[in-house]
Amino acid sequence: MSILGIVVEYNPFHNGHLFHLKKAKELINPDLTIAVMSGNFVQRGEPAIMDNYSRAEIALKAGIDIVVQLPVVYSVQDAGGFALGSVWTLSLLGVTDIVFGSETGNMKLLDVLSDILIEEPTVYVKLLKQHLKTGLSFPNARKAALKDYLKLHLSDFAESIQEIERSNNILGLEYLRAIKQIRSDITPHSIVRTGADYNDPYFKGRFSSATAIRKLIITGQWEKVKQAVPDYSYAIIKRECALKKCPVHLEKMGRFILGLLRRLDREDFKNYYGFTEGLDARFVRCSRQCGEISEFLECVKAKRFTFTRLKRLLMNVILKLSPKLIEQSNKQGPQYIRVLGFNENGRSHLSRIKKKLKVPLLTTPSTWKRVMYKAISGDFEIDQDLFQLQMKRDIMAADIYSLFFDDVKVIKASNEMKRRIIYIRG
């Protein structure tokens, strides 16, 4: 059986995503398509523009058979942790092929680079340290070290060096690395992205970036939004915004975040993943000097810290993501598979494989404790403590996210534990 897996955020689902999905299906001709999707907080260190269930509903209407949620312990990590959690989840579900978008179709180059990252040759490590000493951020230092290593030791790829630069190529590289790291049988494929660059903030018509579309939603430019997304995506975006559940964005969270930070002293930051190189002192000082989150980020920013890294650190504080929890999750993998929605084809598949899975399926959040205890007494390969921590962080993420809806009544009614799975019939 051919099962296509894709890693998505759909923040929000737009015409470029639809193009990728169609091309992926044409390439694999799968019997089933599964998407692992970030929940309410995404990899760029921000809240999603809409909640997890509304984005899953759009994905199902686009033709995906099963949508599962990537636990938040992975969704707000850097490219490596994000890819690891995503690939691990898809592997647990029996996915045979993964297709990702990149700015290059050069799978041979990505394969070579992923080997370098896994094996970490002495020369590469030395080059990386040299670039870090110049004050470059880790992602930029790593790109520079990889480019230098290729020039020195793999001259056949010298002409392809510039392809390393683009963000989607780095993410594709991490998918390959994750597949090798967990020794998965998944076969990776890449298709060239189309349309605007991932971070392009400007409206470019039908193929605008998610960044540009989010700005249009926030500013209420609905005619332009309509051009950039499929009709079913537009209808659900409009519905969620009419319900005052959209848009959610980082600026809305600003005072909440600054309030949390102002309660902390430098030593408190050791409890949160990723705080190194004096960042604790910067966070303490800037949180007390600034009144908006954009101002805070500018205050903390330095050459070696990207804005995205700083925003992820904020998420680690908000969601109480400790070094131990992240390291343990990256070592042991997801402890459950949380299903957000399926169609008839997806439902049938889950019924067939449910008893063969190594981790339990979770379809109703309110039953998670019952599912966990049943799993422990059964044949599942899970860690009870890690299961609880991963699940509690997902629920916490949803509870915090709902605070930023624009209607108090909606906030009160938004209980993640009561959410029902989305089932698209027919």
Swiss-Prot record:
GO MF: ATP binding; ligase activity, forming carbon-nitrogen bonds; tRNA binding
Key words, A-Z: ATP-binding, Cytoplasm, Ligase, Nucleotide-binding, RNA-binding, tRNA processing, tRNA-binding
Enzymatic class: ligase
Entry keyword tRNA processing: yes
Cell location: Cytoplasm
Main location: cytoplasm
Gene3D superfamilies linked to this entry: HUPs
EC number: 6.3.4.-
This protein's record includes keyword tRNA processing: yes
Catalytic activity, as annotated: cytidine(34) in elongator tRNA(Met) + acetate + ATP = N(4)-acetylcytidine(34) in elongator tRNA(Met) + AMP + diphosphate
Coiled coil: none
Role description: Catalyzes the formation of N(4)-acetylcytidine (ac(4)C) at the wobble position of elongator tRNA(Met), using acetate and ATP as substrates. First activates an acetate ion to form acetyladenylate (Ac-AMP) and then transfers the acetyl group to tRNA to form ac(4)C34.
PANTHER family: TRNA(MET) CYTIDINE ACETATE LIGASE
Listed name of the protein: tRNA(Met) cytidine acetate ligase
Organism: Kosmotoga olearia (strain ATCC BAA-1733 / DSM 21960 / TBF 19.5.1)
Gene expressing this chain: tmcAL
